[in-house]
Amino acid sequence: MNSQQCVIIGIAGASASGKSLIAKTIFDELRRDLGTDQIGVINEDAYYKDQSHMSMEERVQTNYDHPKALDHQLLCSHLKQLKAGQAADIPCYSYTEHTRISETIHMTPKKVIILEGILLLTDPKLRDLMDASVFMDTPLDICFLRRLTRDVAERDRTMESVISQYKKTVRPMFLQFIEPSKQYADIIVPRGGKNRIATDILKTRIQHLLAK
């Protein structure tokens, strides 16, 4: 497999904007045509920097919505490996421990790689590796309600901590970094991950890129 046979799609937008849903929909529908081993999803969250050397008190103070919290250099390196036909060991991140864990996920080269994450489009080096990019333009109040429900139910968070983080970093960093990165998207998707027309447009674009 050479670099021309690996299509990389980036899906960005606010936390809980529908990125994972549209990524899963594309994955489920394309794998029927390509085969499960020929399409993969990489979550930008896996590349939060290792904080195992820090105390839990220090870890919870990290601004996870700032580009500096992420190791985009490692993500770029892994994408280049995969495009070159080489496997990559994707890190795993624990939302409860606020750091990476020792396990990794061994990813073999794919025909299609779907990236999803809040800050993907803020990094020009990452953008250069993408064949197409998407921004989920979901209203921020809807994103907040989804995030609150998800983090309390799935990430062992308290309602108070989620609200505090939203006020302190999530909303300000969205306005400073994430929303301005919308200008770099090839496709802007309103109404969240259940937008069927947008999903079909993205699928058609991927199929066109694969046919080149």
From Swiss-Prot:
InterPro entries: P-loop_NTPase, PRK/URK, Uridine_kinase, Uridine_kinase-like. Keywords: ATP-binding, Cytoplasm, Kinase, Nucleotide-binding, Transferase. Belongs to the uridine kinase family. Pfam families: PRK (PF00485). Its main location: cytoplasm. Its EC number is 2.7.1.48. One of its GO terms (biological process) is CTP salvage. CDD domains: UMPK (cd02023). GO terms for cellular component: cytoplasm. GO terms for molecular function: ATP binding; cytidine kinase activity; uridine kinase activity. This is Uridine kinase. The gene is udk. Transmembrane segments: none annotated. It comes from Shewanella denitrificans (strain OS217 / ATCC BAA-1090 / DSM 15013). It catalyses: uridine + ATP = UMP + ADP + H(+); cytidine + ATP = CMP + ADP + H(+).
